[in-house]
Regions:
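Mid-to-C-terminal Rossmann-like scaffold of FAD/NAD(P)H-dependent oxidoreductases
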Residues: 2-3, 22, 275-397
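A Rossmann-like FAD-binding core segment of flavoenzymes
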Residues: 26-30, 72-89, 96, 162-260
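Glycine-rich Rossmann-fold phosphate-binding loop(s) that bind the pyrophosphate
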Residues: 8-12, 126-127, 147-150
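Cysteine/selenocysteine-centered motifs that mediate thiol-based redox chemistry or coordinate metal-sulfur cofactors
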Residues: 413-444
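A short, polar/charged loop-to-alpha-helix boundary motif
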Residues: 397-416
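FAD-site-proximal beta/loop scaffold in flavoenzymes
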Residues: 118-141, 211-220, 224-304, 417
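FAD-binding core/adjacent interface of flavoenzyme oxidoreductases
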Residues: 1-5, 61-145, 220-224, 233-235, ...
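Beta1-alpha1 glycine-rich phosphate/pyrophosphate-binding loop at the start
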Residues: 1-72, 159-180, 398, 402
Length: 444
């Protein structure tokens, strides 16, 4: 009887456990988690903040699901892996033997690197406990400052403002999420943020978090502005959890390196989800993602290979959809507003939760983009070599599914490229007509 151990109870780990049970009815399957909850939806944390969903509704698996599938869930921290003896040592003193091991430990929010980063009142939207802490603090907080440039920072700002906390949002550059949004898109998002009562401070960076008696009292910016606050929300990115690799022969870079079968350099040891650095055919490099669909897909393929298949992982097009201040956002494929350059180096040091390194990999010759904007919605396409390689939609989502299909299948759009590149209504019509024709022909 095979012994499978999975470290991590998130999307990758639970998907793997489910797939292993489907493929092997008799195996012993153990999932190790350092959180007290069954699997929950990390993308759903933002909706808990604004009371769109309850904690109960955010649970992707109920406690009895593990029992029904004969999967042992151990709530303890994995402290050490002995790859030679094939054992995992837990903080509760228990040791687990494995025939095949999956490391799916995810990624963790980067802690505040500023002076005062240790003070009480600094919060992160990184897990369920963090989310509940923000909700608790919002009951008494008068003012908050949010620092960060991605989806999570915007979600945190929206959540605090929703609870009537005076909220300030620091933006390092002169437009929002500059690694992804162009100026027009930034203005569209800005309009929604201001409508929700959030104060935006462009060109400001955190110089120091000030405190008294160990608690946050203010934030000082690089321009000398002091913003009184009770809470500082930090969302400057996430980094893969690599502690288990320290002092071992497990090969890591930004994440745990895997081959095309999601196996690490150590036999029968696999990695999946946010902690894994996986080959990406879109860029030709090994990339890190912090995307829910990627975690699910990689967890499933890892499980198949753990059970004896030789199934290569073919990473799909990076995709994420979010609702920010009432504005729907969808990012598909390579969507950077501009190529990666030295000025973005700091911003790209850590990937944002819900983002992909592929999004910002559009640097280089041969890329053209088209734009459509009606004042409340926008669509932007990025084309290279007669193939749409990326799209970013704000507001109206009518083109989301068609564009995802066209990008995923790398459809040649040369016959409608002129209409696509003209932007506006002609661009939207060309996308929909092309997709409709291909559906009729059974090609998408």
């Amino acid at each position: 009887m095979r012994q499978y151990v999975i470290i991590g109870n998130g999307a990758a780990g639970v998907t793997a456990a489910e797939e292993l049970r489907r493929r092997d009815a008799r195996a012993n399957i153990t999932v190790v988690s350092d959180e007290k909850y069954p699997m929950y939806s990390r993308p759903g944390l933002a909706y808990i903040l604004i009371h769109e969903v309850s904690v109960e509704q955010s649970l992707a698996r109920k406690p009895d699901w593990y029992t029904q599938h004969r999967i042992e869930l151990i709530t303890s921290r994995a402290e050490k892996i002995d790859f030679e003896r094939r054992t995992v040592q837990l903080a509760n003193g228990r040791g687990l033997l494995y025939d095949a091991l999956l490391i799916a430990v995810g990624a963790t929010a980067v802690k505040a690197p500023f002076p005062g980063g240790h003070l009480d009142g600094i919060v992160y939207l990184d897990n369920l406990d963090n989310t509940l802490e923000i909700l608790q603090r919002a009951k008494t907080a008068r003012s908050a400052v949010v620092v960060g440039g991605g989806i999570t920072a915007l979600e945190m700002a929206e959540g605090l403002a929703h609870h009537k906390v005076e909220t300030h949002y620091l933006v390092r550059k002169n437009n929002l999420w500059s690694a992804l949004l162009n100026d027009q898109e930034s203005k569209l998002v800005e309009k929604q943020i201001l409508h929700h009562g959030v104060n935006i401070h462009y060109g400001h960076e955190t110089s120091e978090i000030c405190g008294d008696n160990g608690r946050v009292t203010a934030l000082k910016t690089n321009k000398g502005e002091v913003i009184p606050c009770d809470v500082v929300g930090v969302a400057i990115g996430v980094k893969p959890n690599l502690a288990l690799a320290k002092g071992t022969s497990l090969e890591v870079d930004r994440g745990i390196l895997t081959d095309e079968f999601l196996q690490t350099n150590i036999p029968d040891v696999y990695a999946a989800g946010d902690c894994a650095q996986i080959y990406d055919a879109w860029s030709g490099e090994k990339r890190v993602d912090s995307l829910w669909p990627t975690a699910i897909a990689s967890g499933r393929i890892a499980a198949q290979n753990m059970s004896g298949l030789k199934q290569p992982y073919r990473k799909g097009v990076p995709f994420n959809a979010a609702l920010l201040f009432g504005l729907h956002l969808t990012a598909i494929g390579q969507v950077a507003a501009a190529g990666r350059d030295d000025t973005d180096a700091e911003e790209l040091s850590f990937i944002s939760r819900g983002a992909s390194e592929v999004w910002t990999s559009t640097a280089g010759a041969g890329y053209t983009s088209a734009w459509a904007d009606d004042g409340t919605s926008s669509q932007r396409l990025i084309v290279r070599d007669n193939v749409i390689v990326g799209a970013l939609l704000l507001g109206n989502q009518r083109l989301a599914d068609p564009l995802r299909d066209l990008i995923e299948r790398r459809i040649n759009v040369e016959r409608v490229k002129k209409q696509l590149m003209s932007g506006g209504t002609a661009m939207s019509v060309a996308v929909m007509d092309t997709w409709t024709r291909l559906k009729r022909e059974g090609k998408v």
